[in-house]
Amino acid sequence: MTNPLWFDPNLCLIGGEWKMPVSGQTLPLVNPSDGSEICQIARGGQTDIDAAVRAARSACDGDWGRMTALERGRILTRLGQLVLDRVDDLAQLEAMDVGKPLTQARADAVALARYCEFYGGAADKVMGETIPYLDGYTVYTLREPHGVTGHIVPWNYPMQIIGRSVGAALAMGNACLLKPAEEACLTALAFAHLAIQAGLPLGALNVVPGLGAEAGAALSAHPGVDHISFTGSVATGALVQQAAGRNVVPVTLELGGKSPQLVFEDADLDAALPYLVNAGIQNAGQTCSASSRILVQRGVYDAVKSRMATAYQELTVGPAVQDLRVGPLISTRQKEIVTGFLHQGSDLAIAAEGQIAAGAPESGAYVRPTLFSDVPPDHALARDEIFGPVQVLIPFDTEEQALTIANSTEYGLVASVWTRDGGRQMRLAKGLRSGQVFINNYGAGGGVELPFGGVGKSGHGREKGFEALYGFSQLKTVAAYHG
C-alpha cells in the first residue's frame, strides 16, 4: 500500500491553526500489518490541552456560539459530502493505521459521512416544550449546548466514534476538543482538515494527539471542559470519570462488553450463521459490542457448532491491504493480551481455528481466530472481555437458563435473540440487561439512528440517534409571569 497521507500528521489543531506541540515531541505511529513506522504524530500535553480549551471557549463566545442551528447543520452536511468525496483515501488511512481490512475501513468512512448527514439534518430539529402551569405563567424549556466538550476516542473505530460523538456535539453548538488514540489518529486528523474545508469556524474543533496518560489525563481533569465523552476500557473510563468528577463535569462512558447471542431451537440457522460468526471476528474482534458468547439451546447445539466450525476453518487472517475478512490486531501488545486469554483456554475444547495467510509478515500482530466449545459460563473466556477474534459456545436447556447465563457478566452493551417465538422475543427483550437488544439480527447494520450505550460496566449515557443530541445539550427551564 502506498502512503495515502495528504497532510502533515505530526501537528495539533488548536484554534484553527496547525502547530507542533509546545514540547516539540512526537510519537511513532506503527502499521500493525507489518510493524513498520508509518509516520510521527504530535505528543501533545497539558499546555496544548490548555490552549485547545481556551480556543474552544473562544469559539463558544464568538462566531460559532452565535451561529444558528440551521447554519451548523449545513456545515455538517457539507462535511459529510467531503467525507464521501475522500472515502477511499480515508479507508486507506484507516487500513494502514488500524490494520482494518479495506472493505471494513471503507464502510467506516461511509458511516462517518452518514453521521455528518444525520446530525446535519437533525441540528435544527431539537426543540423544547411548553409546560402547562399556574394562571398567569408561561413556562417553556430550551436545549442549550454544554459549551466545551472533550472527546477521547479509541483506536478500534476512530471514524465511527468521531462521527457519533463529535458530530452530535457540533450539531448542538458545542466546541469540541478531540483526543484521538495514540495508536490510530490519522483519520481524526484527516477529519479535522475536512471540517475546516467545510467551513467550520476556528476553534469549533480542536485536535490534540498524544498519550492517554498525558493529553488524555489533562483533558479529563481540565476545569474548563463542560462535558466529556469517553470510549475505551473500563479501567481507563473509571479514571476519566474520577478526574472529571472533581470538577463536577458530566461524562458519557462507552466501555467494554461481553455480548451474547441466544440461539433457540426454532431459530432460522441459515439466517443466523453469518451474524453469529461476523459479530465475533469483525475488526479482528476488537469491537466493544463484539458477540464473544454464543449461547445455543441443546437441541441445535451440534448443528450450530458444526456450521460455525466450518466457517472458522475458512477464515484467513492477513494484512489490511489484502482485504481478507480478518486483519491484524492493533499492536503486538494487544496480541500478547489475546494470546494470554487463549492460553487460559487450554483446558477447553477448540471447535475450530482460522489460518494466518501465507507470507503474512512475522512482525504483524496476527492471531488465529479461535472458536471454543462447551465452555462453562463462569470460565474466564466466557466472563472477561478479550478484544480479539475469540468466541465461546455455551449450551443451555431452557429460556430461563439462557437469560441467567446472558446476564451473568458485569457487562451489558448488546445482546441478540434468535427465535421465531414472538412471546419469547418480547420476554427476553425485557429481561436482558443490555443497552441494545436485537431480534433475529445483530447490530441492525450499524444503525446511525439507533441510540447506543450500555449498562453495568459497559458504561452509561447514550450516543447515536437523537438521544446523543440530548446528551450533548442541557435543559433550561424558563418560567415567565405576565399576570
Predicted features and spans:
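Rossmann-like NAD(P) dinucleotide-binding subdomain of oxidoreductase/dehydrogenase enzymes
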Residues: 128-271, 323, 396
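Structural signal for hydrophobic packing residues in well-ordered secondary-structure cores
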Residues: 60, 64, 80-87, 91, ...
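ALDH superfamily catalytic-core signature
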Residues: 227, 235-376, 439
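Terminal low-complexity tails and localization/encapsulation signals of metabolic enzymes
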Residues: 1-41, 74-78, 126-152, 252, ...
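Residue-level signal for inorganic ion chemistry
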Residues: 35, 72, 94, 116, ...
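Conserved C-terminal structural/oligomerization subdomain of aldehyde/semialdehyde dehydrogenase
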Residues: 36-39, 225, 262, 316, ...
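A structural signal for short, well-ordered beta-strand elements
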Residues: 28, 42, 65, 98, ...
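Glycine-rich loop-to-alpha-helix module at the N-terminal edge of alpha/beta enzyme cores
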Residues: 36-126
